[in-house]
Amino acid sequence: MFKNLWRVAIVVPRRLATSAEATKPASSRTKRRSTVTQQIVDHFQTSEQFRAHYPYMNPDLLKRRHNVPIGINCMSESDAENIFSSIKGHLNPDIPIIELYPGLGLLTRRLLTLNPKKILAYESDAYFKSVMDSVASDNAELQVYKTHFLRIWSDDLKDKLDGGNRVAQLLPGIEKKEWEDEPAVQIIGVTAQPRYFQFFVNCIAFQCGIISYGRMELYMTVPPEIFWNINCNAASLPMIYSKYLLFNMFFDYELLCLVDEKSFVPWFKRGDRKIAFLKNLDVNRDKFCLMKAVPKRDLLKVIPPRLLTSLWFFTYQGTTTTRNKVIPYLEKWIPDCGPLFISKGLTVFTDFRDLTSNELLDIFVTFVSLPGFEDCPFQAALESFLNRTDDEGLDEEVDRATSGFGVPEPVE
């Protein structure tokens, strides 16, 4: 069953180059790419660190991409300082820090001034890894790993299957804590991938991976479309999917500051359809959002650990169908339970995408407290759902989900 959790919980989309770009003459594509590269280089010319390292950097980082990269690096001294100034008052130097994709270490060097107990940096680019190794050589509290942080999920899965200690080797010195205690680790990074939020949600729902050490404190810099999707009040608002509803149920979060989107590489194309709803929210679409998020301290009192996966399945099933009516869905599992929910204000026409995350959570809590829940087919359906796919191709999918993002096709 553990193998299937990866296949069910982390969707691995296939990356295909657009046929229009592929059919254009090679000379035309090369000219446009070099122009975009020069624009990016010119943008960072005021950075002394960038000028020193630019000749040795992976050139693909300096090309705008069609798809969203999984790793994003900060190249701006000023925005690294902006991020540091916004989070340093929240950080506890006695709690280990994890930094994702530190790049040239602009933020890392600032974090080291806090005299932290430990910094674990995860960098997938070979040259940036060498830069970080040189920083670590003068700072014993800094340890650098060449890997994608998302691989902790698959490593945890393999540990469960063969009794290994892969996760412990990637997270040395992190002490396990009770849920109600202070966070076990502070995670800092930049991402434009909704997959990261799906990853953190799934770790809580399945009580595995990084969450097996206790709660984590997140400081994530994300595009505005991700933050404002999370911050939407109802599932009917644009682009809010089950992972965002569950994120609202599981986490408390706040916006700390805004930073320029061009301060990070690689630059990438953001689809107009995905950001169109921001026009109605009066927000700056060119500014990334630095957010702080912490799993709710009382979460396991509201939802016992044994029911977290059930909540994940309940939310996933309800919100991934375009128009799924709540009461017929509930009565599919427990017949004649509808009148109770009608008395709570629902109608037979209410669908899941009309509900806020708090309303959906309240419905779930009521649903699992019904006398017939333990004997209803809901749990059997959950088990069947988790075991629906076979085990073939797991390692290939894990590789494609992490290292497989290597060199996407650049765009104009």
Predicted segments with their positions:
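Phosphate/oxyanion-binding loops and surfaces in catalytic or ligand/nucleic-acid-binding neighborhoods
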Residues: 233, 237, 333, 370
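Short, flexible/disordered secondary-structure transition segments
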Residues: 118-119, 337-341, 374-378
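Catalytic cores of RNA-modifying enzymes
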Residues: 2-312, 375, 389-411
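Short, charged/polar low-complexity linear motifs in solvent-exposed/disordered segments
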Residues: 247, 345, 379-381
